[in-house]
UniProtKB/Swiss-Prot annotation:
This is Succinate dehydrogenase assembly factor 2, mitochondrial. The keyword Chaperone applies. The keyword Mitochondrion applies. Keywords: Chaperone, Mitochondrion. InterPro entries: SDH (IPR005631), SDH_sf (IPR036714), SDHAF2 (IPR028882). It is found in: Mitochondrion matrix. PANTHER family: PROTEIN EMI5 HOMOLOG, MITOCHONDRIAL, SUCCINATE DEHYDROGENASE ASSEMBLY FACTOR 2, MITOCHONDRIAL. Its main location: mitochondrion. One of its GO terms (biological process) is mitochondrial respiratory chain complex II assembly. Interacts with the flavoprotein subunit within the SDH catalytic dimer. Plays an essential role in the assembly of succinate dehydrogenase (SDH), an enzyme complex (also referred to as respiratory complex II) that is a component of both the tricarboxylic acid (TCA) cycle and the mitochondrial electron transport chain, and which couples the oxidation of succinate to fumarate with the reduction of ubiquinone (coenzyme Q) to ubiquinol. Required for flavinylation (covalent attachment of FAD) of the flavoprotein subunit of the SDH catalytic dimer. It comes from Schizosaccharomyces japonicus (strain yFS275 / FY16936). Coiled coil: none annotated. Belongs to the SDHAF2 family. The lineage of its organism: Eukaryota, Fungi, Dikarya, Ascomycota, Taphrinomycotina.
């Protein structure tokens, strides 16, 4: 179990992406682990409408922090989010709470996703989206 003292957690809020970023001295600590240990509290969005949720997710998919993840998630959001119900949108929202590099490695298969993401339909759809577009040059979709 990690504590605040042991990981020397430092966070900042990125105005560009609206996503919390973390640095730590622990060997490998994901955003999910920080949430599980209640080291951080997510923003309460319980009263958010479906339309607002969908719009926020499209925006957050475009403005991540690293270009590779921006390109993958923005195209994925344009193609898939309109088909998702509220439950899947919330699952995608939870995925966006993960670090950019983790999402990139998990969806490309470079690293194994944590156990709680292994049966995720969203992550499975994201992997399918990437594999079906092999050799395609990606551009940021229009807003």
């Amino acid at each position: 179990m990690f504590s605040i003292k042991s990981i020397q957690l430092c966070r900042y809020f990125s105005r560009k992406s609206g996503v919390l970023r973390y640095w730590h001295s622990a060997p490998y600590l994901t955003h999910s682990k920080l949430l599980e240990d209640k080291l951080i509290r997510p923003v309460d969005r319980s009263k958010e409408t479906e339309k607002l949720l969908r719009s926020r997710l499209v925006y957050q998919s475009r403005k991540r922090g690293i270009l590779e993840t921006d390109l993958i998630l923005s195209g994925f959001a344009k193609e898939y989010l309109s088909k998702y119900n509220v439950e899947l949108l919330k699952e995608y929202d939870n995925l966006l709470n993960e670090a950019d590099w983790d999402i990139l490695y998990w969806c490309t298969g470079e690293r194994q996703a944590p156990e709680h993401w292994l049966n995720s339909r969203v992550l499975r759809d994201l992997k399918e989206y990437l594999s079906s577009k092999n050799g395609v040059v990606r551009f940021m979709p229009e807003l």
